C-alpha cells in the first residue's frame, strides 16, 4: 500500500516540499537560514497575536497598554520581549540568508530572488510599523522622521505624507492605521513565503560549489530536517538568552518615555537593523538624494543578477571576489555603526566613505573582478 503522505491531496504537497524533496548532498550550514526564518515568522505571528489581544491602538492608552502587558498579563513580559527580540533574530537570519545568496550566486534563480526582495521590503515595512506601536519617544519621532522622507518626492510629496499620517502630524489616525497594517502584513509575508518556496522548488536548491547537483541528490528528510533542528536549537538558545538576560540590549532607552510631540530626543534613530540604510540616507546632504540612496541601498539587490559577469556561479573558487565580499560585509557593519552615531565629525566623513564604498563594490568592483578572474582562468 502506498504511504498516505504520497497520495493525500494536501499531505503530498507537504511531502514533496519537506520530506521527499531531493536536495544537494553538499549543503552547508548557510542553507539553514531559510527554515530559521520560517520559525521566526511563526514565533512573531504567535507572540504578536497574543500581544494584540491586550494592546490598544489609541495615543492616550497605547503606552500604558504595553506597560500593562508587561506588568499585569500572565507572561506578558515574555511575549513582549520575545516579539521585540524575535524581530532582531528575524533580521539577523534575513541578512545572513541574503549574504549566503550573494556569496554562492543563488541570485541567478531570478524569480526566487525577486520574491525574496519583495519579502525583505514587506518585513522591513512590518518592523517599522511595529516599532511605532508602543508609542514611546523613539516610536513617535522615528515615525515622524521616516514618513516625512516621502515629502522629498516632487509635486505629490507633501500630500502623500499627510495622506499617510491621516492629518497634519503623526497622531491617533496614524497609530491606528499602523496597527492595522502591522497586523495584516505578516499574513501577506506568509503568502509571499509560499510563493518564494514554490519558485525555489521549481529549480531546486543551489549548492556551495555552484555546479549542478542533479547527479548527487539526497532526500530532505531525515538529513536536512535533523540539520535544521540543530540550527533551530542554536537560534532558540540565543533568542532565549537575549530575552531572559538582556531584553533591552538592542532597544532604545528613549522608548521607555511616553511620546511627547513637544520634546524632540537628542538623537533620533531607527532600530539597529535599519541603521545601514539610515547611514546611507544621512551621508547625502540633499533630502531627495538621501531618500534615493536609502531605497537604492536595498533595491540594488534587484540588479545584482544583471551584474553577474563571472563564468562561475559561486564565489567558492574565486578568491578575489571573496575579498570584495568580505570588504562589503565590513562596510555594512561600519554603516550600521555610523547610523547609530550623532551627526558630527568624524562620523559624517566615515559614513560618506562607507556609503560610496558600498555602492562602488556592488555596482563596479564586483563585476570588474569577475571579468579579471575569467581572464586569469583563461575562460
Swiss-Prot record:
The keyword Repeat does not apply. Its main location: mitochondrion. A ubiquinone binds at residue 201. Binds 2 heme b groups non-covalently. It is found in: Mitochondrion inner membrane. The keyword ATP-binding does not apply. Heme 1 (or BL or b562) is low-potential and absorbs at about 562 nm, and heme 2 (or BH or b566) is high-potential and absorbs at about 566 nm. This is Cytochrome b.
Amino acid at each position: 500500500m502506498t504511504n498516505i503522505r504520497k497520495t493525500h491531496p494536501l499531505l503530498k504537497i507537504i511531502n514533496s516540499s519537506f520530506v521527499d524533496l531531493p536536495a544537494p548532498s553538499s549543503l552547508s550550514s548557510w542553507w539553514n537560514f531559510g527554515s530559521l526564518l520560517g520559525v521566526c515568522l511563526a514565533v512573531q505571528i504567535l507572540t504578536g497575536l497574543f500581544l494584540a489581544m491586550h494592546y490598544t491602538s489609541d495615543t492616550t492608552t497605547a503606552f500604558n497598554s504595553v506597560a500593562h502587558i508587561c506588568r499585569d498579563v500572565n507572561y506578558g513580559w515574555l511575549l513582549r520581549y520575545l516579539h521585540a527580540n524575535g524581530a532582531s533574530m528575524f533580521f539577523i537570519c534575513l541578512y545572513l540568508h541574503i549574504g549566503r545568496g550573494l556569496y554562492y550566486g543563488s541570485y541567478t534563480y531570478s524569480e526566487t530572488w525577486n520574491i525574496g526582495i519583495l519579502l525583505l521590503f514587506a518585513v522591513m515595512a512590518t518592523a517599522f510599523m511595529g516599532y511605532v506601536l508602543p508609542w514611546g519617544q523613539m516610536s513617535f519621532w522615528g515615525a515622524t522622521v521616516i514618513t516625512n522622507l516621502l515629502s522629498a518626492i516632487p509635486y505629490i510629496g507633501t500630500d502623500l505624507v499627510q495622506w499617510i499620517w491621516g492629518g497634519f502630524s503623526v497622531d491617533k489616525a496614524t497609530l491606528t492605521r499602523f496597527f492595522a497594517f502591522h497586523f495584516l502584513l505578516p499574513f501577506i509575508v506568509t503568502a509571499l513565503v509560499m510563493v518564494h518556496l514554490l519558485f525555489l522548488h521549481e529549480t531546486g536548491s543551489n549548492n556551495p560549489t555552484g555546479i549542478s547537483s542533479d547527479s548527487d541528490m539526497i532526500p530532505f528528510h531525515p538529513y536536512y530536517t535533523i540539520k535544521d533542528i540543530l540550527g533551530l536549537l542554536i537560534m532558540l538558545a540565543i533568542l532565549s538568552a537575549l530575552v531572559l538576560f538582556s531584553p533591552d540590549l538592542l532597544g532604545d532607552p528613549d522608548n521607555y518615555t511616553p511620546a511627547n510631540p513637544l520634546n524632540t530626543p537628542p538623537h533620533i534613530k531607527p532600530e539597529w537593523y535599519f541603521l545601514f540604510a539610515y547611514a546611507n540616507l544621512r551621508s547625502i546632504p540633499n533630502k531627495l538624494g538621501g531618500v534615493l540612496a536609502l531605497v537604492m541601498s536595498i533595491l540594488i539587490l534587484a540588479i545584482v543578477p544583471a551584474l553577474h559577469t563571472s563564468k562561475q556561479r559561486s564565489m567558492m573558487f574565486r578568491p578575489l571576489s571573496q575579498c570584495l565580499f568580505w570588504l562589503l560585509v565590513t562596510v555594512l557593519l561600519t554603516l550600521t555603526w555610523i547610523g547609530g552615531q550623532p551627526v558630527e565629525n568624524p562620523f559624517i566623513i566615515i559614513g560618506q566613505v562607507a556609503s560610496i564604498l558600498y555602492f562602488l563594490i556592488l555596482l563596479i568592483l564586483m563585476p570588474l573582478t569577475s571579468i579579471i578572474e575569467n581572464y586569469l582562468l583563461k575562460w
